[in-house]
Amino acid sequence: MNKQKLKKFFDNREEFAPNERLWLFCMLMSIAGFWGGFTYSLRGRVFVNAQTGNLVFLSLGIASWDTALIKNALATFLAYFLGIITAELISKEINKVSFLIWERILLFFSLIVTICLGFIPETAPFEFTNFSIAFTAAMQFNTFEKAHGMGMATPFCTNHVKQASAYFVRFLKTRDSSKLRISLSHLSMILSFITGATLSIFLGRFFLGKAIWLSSVFLVITLYFFSKSLKNYKARKLK
């Protein structure tokens, strides 16, 4: 794959709006992986991005009457639930004001959240961090739903594993390059998640809660290039 094809693979400007480009989803996926590794390794061993594991932890806490586990898992679940509701209620109304302004607001909000979380002392209850991240991740999940025409989830990997493997088999059967492209797109999401999670766990050993600030750096980069691509997209539309 040459440089031009690789650029189109991640940033197909001709066919898709700025909020539907694969590079953006890979960045959000690496941030989600970072958050998942951070909360699991440093903040009570909960999963902020996907709630299936937390419901298992909640059930385990109830069965063993571990109140700390119940409280942590339940707070994360409720935060995720509220994040979905919040994004669903306000995103479309806000975007009526200006094209994709909600997406920019959400990225900026995510940045502020992660910066603030880095100042929380290690002795603070885990719920402060887990609630904030779960709420933010849920809003991202509800807001960024499609990349390059494909349904994409930004906080977790289960569907990406299914799609990457299923479309690879379909490619082998048909030799249809579009199916290989879909498989590789989902695989890039998985690799992005692994990269983010690995970085957070590694850096957390040295910087503890301050490690969350690396995800702030990722968000600054994402917000900058998203705003830039939006500006270019609007300029092309006016021609």
Stretches found by the model and what they are:
Residues 2-239:
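Alpha-helical transmembrane segments of multi-pass membrane proteins
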